[in-house]
Amino acid sequence: MAVPRQRAAGGLCGDGHHRFWLGPGGGALLAGSGRCRGGGLVILLDVPASMLHGGLNFRQVRWRAIGAILPGMAVGALIGLWLMGQLDKRWPLFLLGLYITWVGWRTLRHGQQAARALPGWTHHAGSGLVGVLEVMFATAGPMVIALLQRRLREVAEIRATVPVVMVVAASIAIAVLFGAGQIDRAHTFERWLVALPIAFMGVVLGNRLARHIPPPAMRRAMAVLLIASGLSLTQHLWR
């Protein structure tokens, strides 16, 4: 079933706006425009929109945290490609949604806490899950936020670092999916040319709004949007 243009445009602009605040990638698109039927488009939008977002906050990017995620993410992308033909996607999306909702609720309830790095194996598993999710669902952003919240204390650092991780994650996913012939090039690129300016507009609008929001309020907004993204993912179990 096709998504009405007005609704799709709203979802795209919302994703760009959402992305500037928090950088969560496809979460808003998934909720607003039926993500599971447009994964190639979402991933292709992730790269330029996240580059714009990251460029606007370049000085606050924490590169060491990105380097710690990269190896597991690359391996996870290959695992995700294999899993695409093996699993019913509804249950993984449901479980992911529960986890993201829990992370958002914990952040909303407890506020700012000292960053505590995850144990080595747990961090690598989470990094691998980022690659799996980006390839299978184009919605790894909430998981990236959950990981970075355990490594970075300042919300501004998280907001700046997430889109850089998403540029890399989406680039890996695009390479893997193109190599496997999983992206319909003709239709996807045609829609991409139309959707990209709308996503950029959302990023710019979010940029202006974010200047007037204090860090505690930004952290609460992050938590609320994580909860919204998580709950939207759980709905796929009944579709």
Swiss-Prot record:
Q: Name one Pfam family in it.
A: TauE
User: What is the first-listed, main subcellular location in coarse terms?
Assistant: membrane
Annotated transmembrane regions: 65-85, 128-148, 160-180, 186-206
* Name of this chain's protein: Probable inner membrane transporter protein TsaS
Record keywords: Cell inner membrane, Cell membrane, Membrane, Plasmid, Transmembrane, Transmembrane helix, Transport
Record lineage: Bacteria, Pseudomonadati, Pseudomonadota, Betaproteobacteria, Burkholderiales
User: What upregulates or represses it?
Assistant: Constitutively expressed.
* Annotated function: Involved in the uptake of p-toluenesulphonate (TSA).
Subcellular localization is given as:
Cell inner membrane
Q: One Gene Ontology cellular component annotation?
A: plasma membrane
Question: How would you describe this protein's topology in the membrane?
Answer: Multi-pass membrane protein
State the similarity comment.
Belongs to the 4-toluene sulfonate uptake permease (TSUP) (TC 2.A.102) family.
Q: What does the subunit section of this Swiss-Prot or TrEMBL entry state?
A: Part of a two-component transport system composed of TsaT and TsaS.
